[in-house]
Amino acid sequence: AGAIVAFEAGHSDSGDPESFLTATTDKQHNWEYVRVPGLNLFPGLCCPHYDKIQSNGVLRATDFDSMMKRHPGERGIGIDHWAALKVEGENYQVLSPQDKEGSVLSDGTFSSDRKGTPGVWILECVGENNTCIVQRQLAPASGLVSELFRSATTVSEDLRLDSIRTQNPAAFEKDVKK
């Protein structure tokens, strides 16, 4: 769960059969990312490893844009693989080792092929729900939490989550028995 657990929800690879308690390998790696609920310590829809391509061959940033269009009332926070978001009281700080690859080019624009340094992105859907455009802006290196996060105007659960829970019942049953 990592970063996702602190947020209202997150962009999860829980649909990857290799991550199931009883792992199976789908040789075609034909699985989809899914929106999963978090503990809601911070408002927003979090995408960890934002700059990475997982075993399904899909760049998380690209898929996160699609997820944002399905959940246009939520603010997205994309955290690169080597970046971290530190929150202390009313302030936040982006931690970014400059010797690691990431999606932030020197001019502050996005690199889908990790030609920059790690960073954190803020994503918003602008326009009508069915035709909204996802806008991405680089989060400042530090600032007020109130400027980074915002509460959702609408939330819709991902209907695919039930299917994943059905495919991976052992993990759910193990948690229930505790």
Identify the function of each model-found stretch.
Residues 1-8:
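Catalytic nucleophile loop
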Residues 12-178:
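C-terminal and late-domain segments of enzyme folds
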